[in-house]
């Protein structure tokens, strides 16, 4: 345990450097300076004059480039896109101060570690981090992975832990290999699902929440719409980095497209028993040991909707039952890949807990899975939409297999542009929904601890 006197001494003498002032870099810069650390930052050199004016009143110091950050900093954090990490470390890494500590914030650590090992001076320690949440989420209580990859100086690890303590996150210690496997297991399939959903809606040019109570109405639909739009309100590289640079993610995204295709084939071939057997096996594998409360309940699911319609003012019109192919394919993928999503809850992002929650709800709410299978076989109201969804899932799988950031960016931004007019409202509702769901899941965890 580091003494308070030691931490105060570090704050008075040490400098934290941040290369890259995107959303997460800025979050770290503000959190660290608010906690009393000296922070020096830079972004791309051509933005210097603009950012100097923008952050004139900020507590951190802004300099022109990463060379100036690297020469002065005792802990350097590269907060840059995964696609650029190697190039940027190659440029600024050799300027690192003697004996400094270096880390990064990318969502896939293999290329980051490779860049550090290749371009950093041998006297640098490598202790890297990953906050498993977005910049709009409160850092308190969220998972923060710390990877002590190379430490020659005993105080280095204690120092990084002391710096990160101001985030009030749950610190999790992993190797970079463990980190990459876990992030793929918890994010690759679920991101593919909601990217494909948004892509399918954009292709058929509909905002699903505007169609009244007939289609895409109700609790599960609220979450699907809100999460899909939340993903498309972020920057494309947030998801591209994980999907393209993480080898484990490739297999999982391919499996998601395969699961969606195979389940859809069973639906259109009217193979009800085969579909039922397959989904019950998936249910047993993923949820067989589940006890206690569900992560989500009806009250939360019904509360947050973009739709202006309601059952009460629509002549008692009932929503058309949905096949929920996108959610069925998530659970089937976990089953086919042998992934137990509950194994990684300590490293789960806020969005992953919601993905797991809606999947849990669909498979464990009494009668709902059976109703969903019945709708998939006997009610063809969603068949055209499901076909478009399968095409979108396969497209995303192909984009990832090409490992081309430009193609990924183009695909993502074309869908983003379609939803752009709706994103501000969706973000407001989505933020409230996420806050409520995370609070509910914390309450559930506390209740289960009391009962054990």
UniProtKB/Swiss-Prot annotation:
It catalyses: prephenate + NADP(+) = 3-(4-hydroxyphenyl)pyruvate + CO2 + NADPH. Belongs to the prephenate/arogenate dehydrogenase family. InterPro entries: 6-PGluconate_DH-like_C_sf, 6PGDH_NADP-bd, NAD(P)-bd_dom_sf, Preph/Arog_dehydrog, Prephen_DH, Prephenate_DH_fun. Pathway: Amino-acid biosynthesis; L-tyrosine biosynthesis; (4-hydroxyphenyl)pyruvate from prephenate (NADP(+) route): step 1/1. Pfam families: NAD_binding_2. GO terms for cellular component: cytoplasm. Signal peptide: none annotated. Keywords: Amino-acid biosynthesis, Aromatic amino acid biosynthesis, NADP, Oxidoreductase, Tyrosine biosynthesis. Its EC number is 1.3.1.13. One of its GO terms (molecular function) is NADP binding. This is Prephenate dehydrogenase [NADP(+)]. Gene3D superfamilies: 6-phosphogluconate dehydrogenase C-terminal like domain, NAD(P)-binding Rossmann-like Domain. Present with 2180 molecules/cell in log phase SD medium. It comes from Saccharomyces cerevisiae (strain ATCC 204508 / S288c).
């Amino acid at each position: 345990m580091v003494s308070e006197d030691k931490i105060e001494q570090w704050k008075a003498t040490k400098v934290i450097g941040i290369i890259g002032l995107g959303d997460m870099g800025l979050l770290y810069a503000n959190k660290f300076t608010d906690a009393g650390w000296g922070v020096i930052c830079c972004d791309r050199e051509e933005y210097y004059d603009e950012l100097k004016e923008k952050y004139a009143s900020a507590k951190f110091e802004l300099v022109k480039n990463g060379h100036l950050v690297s020469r002065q900093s005792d802990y350097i954090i590269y907060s840059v896109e995964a696609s650029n990490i190697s190039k940027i470390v190659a440029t600024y890494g050799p300027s690192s101060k003697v004996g400094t500590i270096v880390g990064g914030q990318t969502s896939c650590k293999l290329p980051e570690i490779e860049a550090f090992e290749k371009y950093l001076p041998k006297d640098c320690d490598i202790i890297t981090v990953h906050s498993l949440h977005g910049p709009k989420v409160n850092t308190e209580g969220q998972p923060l992975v710390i990877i002590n990859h190379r430490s020659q100086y005993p105080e280095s690890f204690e120092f990084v832990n002391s710096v990160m303590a101001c985030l009030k996150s749950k610190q999790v210690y992993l190797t970079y290999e463990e980190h990459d496997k876990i992030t793929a297991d918890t994010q690759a399939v679920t991101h593919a699902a909601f990217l494909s959903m948004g892509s399918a809606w954009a292709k058929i040019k509909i905002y699903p929440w505007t169609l009244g109570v007939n289609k895409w109405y109700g609790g599960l639909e609220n979450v699907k719409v809100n999460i899909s739009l939340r993903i498309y309100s972020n920057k494309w590289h947030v998801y591209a980095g994980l999907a393209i640079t993480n080898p484990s993610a490739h297999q999982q995204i391919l499996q998601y497209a395969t699961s969606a295709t195979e389940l859809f084939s069973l639906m259109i071939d009217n193979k009800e028993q085969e579909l039922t057997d397959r989904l019950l096996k998936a249910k047993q594998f993923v949820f067989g040991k589940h006890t206690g409360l569900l992560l989500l309940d009806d009250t939360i699911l019904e509360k947050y909707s973009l739709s202006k319609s309601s059952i009460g003012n629509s002549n008692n019109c009932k929503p058309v039952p949905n096949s929920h192919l996108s959610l069925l394919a998530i659970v089937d993928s976990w089953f086919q890949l042998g992934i137990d999503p509950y194994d990684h809850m300590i490293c789960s992002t806020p969005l992953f807990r919601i993905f797991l929650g809606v999947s849990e709800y669909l498979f464990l709410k009494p009668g709902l899975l059976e109703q969903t299978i019945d709708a998939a076989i006997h009610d063809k109201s969603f068949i055209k939409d499901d076909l478009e969804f399968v095409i979108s899932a396969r497209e995303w799988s192909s984009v990832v297999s090409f490992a081309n950031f430009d193609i990924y960016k183009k695909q993502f931004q074309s869908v983003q542009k379609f939803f752009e007019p709706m994103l501000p409202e969706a973000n407001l509702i989505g933020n409230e929904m996420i806050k409520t769901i995370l609070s509910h899941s914390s309450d559930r965890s506390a209740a289960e601890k009391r009962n054990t």
